[in-house]
Amino acid sequence: MASLASLYGFRMLGLFMVLPILALYMDDYPGFSPLLLGICLGIYGLTQAALQIPLGLLSDKIGRRPVIIGGLLVFVLGSLVAASAETSTGLIVGRAIQGAGAIASTLMALVSDLTSEENRTKAMATIGASIGMSFMLAMIVGPLIA
């Protein structure tokens, strides 16, 4: 279970690392505004939310692992697009692609599949803790590598 929590935490670290630095760099993108900053931050959650159920259903059909691996690859692709973006549009597209790598529901389903009922609460709490740890680490590491 620790490996799944680490996997989820690593993915969340990629999401959270941009939070403390994106506003600082918005002047580097022509025409970037507070509105576009909000869209850039929010588009990730929008695409993730829109794809949780379809990807969860897909994982019921083809298995959890292929969807998780595919989601991580999509997330990496989105990260590369966002990191190489020279315009606010490119940055927003990259963040949307990152969100399309939605694995949260599939990962939780895999945890549920792999744990007994008496250990499920502990497993879910471990994943929840990984989210908090990722957020804390991202607030420190993000600005250091920027």
Model-inferred region functions:
Residues 23, 134-146:
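Small-residue (Gly/Pro/Ala) motifs that create kinks and tight helix-helix packing interfaces
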Residues 1-24:
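Pair of pore-lining "gating" transmembrane helices in MFS-fold secondary transporters
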Residues 32-41, 124:
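Juxtamembrane helix-start elements in MFS-like secondary transporters
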Residues 20-35:
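Short amphipathic helix-loop junctions that connect adjacent transmembrane helices
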Residues 50-86:
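Conserved MFS/SLC helix-loop-helix module at the cytosolic interface between two early adjacent transmembrane helices
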Residues 45-53, 135-136:
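Residue-level signature of mid-helix packing/kink "hotspots" within the transmembrane helices
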Residues 9, 78, 89-102:
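Hydrophobic core of transmembrane alpha-helices in multi-pass small-molecule transporters
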Residues 94-130:
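Cytoplasmic helix-loop-helix junction between adjacent transmembrane helices
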